[in-house]
């Protein structure tokens, strides 16, 4: 009560220019050991400055855009004394005991000490017309401080910065050493009191000027000497910017602004500063800000357009892919092969984990492929190899080969590996062919022949191997276990056949077995009817198994429970769109049948007996007639060169009746096309390229017409018999057509010799020079 009366009797500073408010002013003196000077100026909006003395009536001008970082926010003395608004030492009163260092935790009490506008005469704050109640020690301290200020030195209420490194922000004091510029020194000399007219805004502004390059003779410049203090970061950030939770908003306030609103905002602000969660958030945000504050003047922020954030995300993803953290090996190629900018960044970061320095190209490629299986579409794999080529050039800058040349060699090595070690029967690529295929592909120049020979021999002696995915390995092992115990119902493998090394069609190993027995094979022609070299024409005995649309040639006797070896898979032959006929023009051996495949390879097989030969011919042709899918239309082009259309290797989805109608339609189409082709013959005896193309097309149409005639005859017979028993079908054909049911001119064989069928003259062997 006595305190309220005393406050009401004391006039406040600036009553002459400000109307009294309806609400009583709270005591702004020292509470809980916290000085009242500093936070008022730092928390108010720009332009709202306190008046030091009645004599100092001129408001110091200040740029509102200037951000001040170093202020004396509150000076707490360990001996129980505090500095007043005029830098005077305040006496220790009973109300302020006990002194505590962490005044920010007491939000309500501390908020009342932030505004020194309402002076308390009992504390000796030099209100207008009030007696000075300071003791001799206070007066002596002020004289010492004034002499230090006039000499241009600096003063801090703390002897050291140890108090600012406390772990708890609420228990730490904040102090900043502001430089004393000539302007501030002049005001200090002209002012009757040492602290009068020393506006906080001016201190901040001049402090920034001093930090930017003031005269070093007048004191050391301000360089954020306490930037490591989290308490300073929190309070300075609170005073500089609006809070995201709405506690503080910057608004234009002049000297006559609403102080009640300021005091309420200050209470909220200080209470929020005492919240540990909020302080942590502010500290984190301030640490993020400090990283950008370290940039040189005029430098652009790297996070302005998000480039650095995207780059960091790409690096994190690449590191996880390389160390397989949350990813499998099969996921690597899928991530690196995408066609977008982020995937290219990820690929570049991923390749940075590899060091190809000093390695040969094939050695670097082997190292790279051991990290993950290179899977996906052709364009996806090509993108991955592009990133590999770029990284190889970065690690070997002294290599004279360009990046495009390295990429060309890399793709060539991949194709060479498939050609030399793939499951294809065709002729392997020679070293001379490998060199010829790369002519003038090194930016218009040729690669060094020694380099190409070295790469060829390396791939030939040791094939490229890449990592096996763990899931695929476990799946394969589980299939083997299921097969051993009879639990596996269906197994699938991939048979790589033909001249195209990228054509791999899954075939069910548990498909129906139509025939098996001993056959002796001779390769007569390779792909496209090219004559097989003499070194590979020899006869070899196999145990043949016709399972589904695949003719497996095994070295050992057939056993249903035995898995196929790699050599057995290499010798496998597809019989889709194939035609088996009796090789009547081959007189060196008896009981020989000829098999011509969809890619025009020709094989000769010798059976143990005539009956076995006829049975093999019937069953191969019947399987091809039932399961061969309809052919695609031929390509349309203005070129005169004839190209055979590709025949699908997949199984047809048509039923047998629909399949029969499809064959009949195709036969009519071929018959009409052959008739039209023969209407425009070329002169005989001409050996021009045009004549060769004419004869090749006629030979193709004749063979296709004979093949479909055979398919139609056998499929119609099967439908008529109404049974899947092949022995009954063979007996039916033997009854209708005599001893050689498969050699009727109009059905099975386009390769009949003259006089084989009595009373009829056959045409020349439709296979022409292939036999």
Swiss-Prot record:
One of its GO terms (cellular component) is dendrite. It holds the Pfam family PH_9. The modification Phosphoserine is found at residue 191. Residues 47-66 have a biased composition (Basic and acidic residues). The chain crosses the membrane at residues 622-639. Residues 1-67, 107-136, 207-230, 244-307, 739-771 are annotated as: Disordered. Residues 218-230, 288-299 have a biased composition (Low complexity). It is a single-pass membrane protein. GO terms for molecular function: guanyl-nucleotide exchange factor activity; phospholipid binding. Disulfide bonds: none annotated. Residues 260-462 form the SEC7 domain. Residues 651-680 form a coiled coil. GO terms for biological process: regulation of ARF protein signal transduction. InterPro entries: PH-like_dom_sf (IPR011993), PH_9 (IPR041681), PH_dom-spectrin-type (IPR001605), PH_domain (IPR001849), Sec7_C_sf (IPR023394), Sec7_dom (IPR000904), Sec7_dom_sf (IPR035999). Keywords: Cell membrane, Cell projection, Coiled coil, Membrane, Phosphoprotein, Transmembrane, Transmembrane helix. It is found in: Cell membrane; Cell projection, Ruffle membrane; Cleavage furrow. Residues 748-761 have a biased composition (Polar residues). Gene3D superfamilies: Arf Nucleotide-binding Site Opener,domain 2, Pleckstrin-homology domain (PH domain)/Phosphotyrosine-binding domain (PTB). Residues 512-625 form the PH domain. Belongs to the PSD family. This is PH and SEC7 domain-containing protein 2. The lineage of its organism: Eukaryota, Metazoa, Chordata, Craniata, Vertebrata.
